[in-house]
């Protein structure tokens, strides 16, 4: 009999019902035909998708998309592919792309593990961002955490030599786990001695700034592909 816990572990998300506002639904209806990429189990040519040769950065789980849009706007020489399954976030980021007139950002609403397995070529990415993934803070739910060895192994294969993997979390025990998992991958090396300072390209969110004022920590982990 197949282990149901393993079936859960290979997905990159747990689907939660989120209510789309009318504006988010409209933005998604108008935006996804322009900026969305449909899931197909075949390798895509990222240069063809974006219409140019430029560094390609993948973000898994962009939430409401505010930081993603800000990063794309501040780094027009890079191309960004964001993956998120929850409708309100996808709709909100479509709205931000339109408002900021971004041309270097594309979206997918699909399970990131399937996209990695079937659509992204090995050595095709210059960077991967996973910012503030669900911490699943109850111990019995820790197995649902996204950043675990099987996913990191997949991501390492998709990175070019010298490409980077950047994770950030505000849960210390998850930060410890992330560091352990990444240290355990022979293809990756830490860019810092333990945790890294927040790079300029990752914007400080309002939530994060408020937490820092209250004395809460945020941990950035940045590794490079050997």
UniProtKB/Swiss-Prot annotation:
GO terms for cellular component: tRNA methyltransferase complex. InterPro entries: SAM-dependent_MTases_sf, tRNA_(Gua-N-7)_MeTrfase_Trmb, tRNA_methyltr_TrmB_bact. Substrate binds at residues 138, 170, 205-208. Keywords: Methyltransferase, S-adenosyl-L-methionine, Transferase, tRNA processing. The active site is at 134. Pathway: tRNA modification; N(7)-methylguanine-tRNA biosynthesis. This is tRNA (guanine-N(7)-)-methyltransferase. It comes from Chromobacterium violaceum (strain ATCC 12472 / DSM 30191 / JCM 1249 / CCUG 213 / NBRC 12614 / NCIMB 9131 / NCTC 9757 / MK). GO terms for molecular function: tRNA (guanine(46)-N7)-methyltransferase activity. It catalyses: guanosine(46) in tRNA + S-adenosyl-L-methionine = N(7)-methylguanosine(46) in tRNA + S-adenosyl-L-homocysteine. Transmembrane segments: none annotated. Catalyzes the formation of N(7)-methylguanine at position 46 (m7G46) in tRNA. Pfam families: Methyltransf_4. Residues 140-145 are annotated as: Interaction with RNA. HAMAP family: tRNA_methyltr_TrmB. The lineage of its organism: Bacteria, Pseudomonadati, Pseudomonadota, Betaproteobacteria, Neisseriales. Belongs to the class I-like SAM-binding methyltransferase superfamily. TrmB family. Its EC number is 2.1.1.33. S-adenosyl-L-methionine binds at residues 59, 84, 111, 134.
């Amino acid at each position: 009999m197949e282990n149901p816990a393993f079936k859960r572990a290979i997905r990159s998300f747990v689907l939660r019902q989120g209510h789309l506002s009318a504006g988010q639904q409209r933005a998604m209806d108008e935006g996804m035909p322009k900026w969305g990429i449909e899931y197909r189990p075949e390798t895509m040519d990222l240069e063809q998708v974006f219409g140019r040769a430029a560094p390609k950065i993948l973000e898994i789980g962009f939430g409401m998309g505010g930081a993603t849009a800000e990063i794309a706007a501040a780094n027009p020489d890079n191309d960004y592919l964001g993956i998120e399954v929850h409708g309100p976030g996808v709709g909100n980021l479509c709205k931000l792309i339109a408002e900021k007139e971004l041309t270097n950002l594309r979206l997918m609403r699909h399970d990131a593990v399937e996209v990695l397995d079937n659509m992204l070529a090995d050595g095709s990415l210059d960077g991967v961002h996973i910012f503030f993934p669900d911490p699943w803070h109850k111990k019995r739910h820790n197995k649902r955490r996204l950043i675990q060895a099987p996913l990191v192994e997949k991501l390492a294969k998709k990175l070019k030599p010298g490409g980077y993997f950047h994770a950030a979390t505000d849960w210390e025990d998850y930060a410890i786990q992330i560091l352990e998992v990444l240290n355990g991958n022979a293809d990756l090396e830490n860019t810092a001695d333990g945790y890294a300072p927040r790079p300029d390209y990752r914007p400080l969110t309002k939530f994060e700034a408020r937490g820092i004022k209250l004395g809460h920590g945020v941990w950035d982990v940045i590794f490079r592909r050997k």
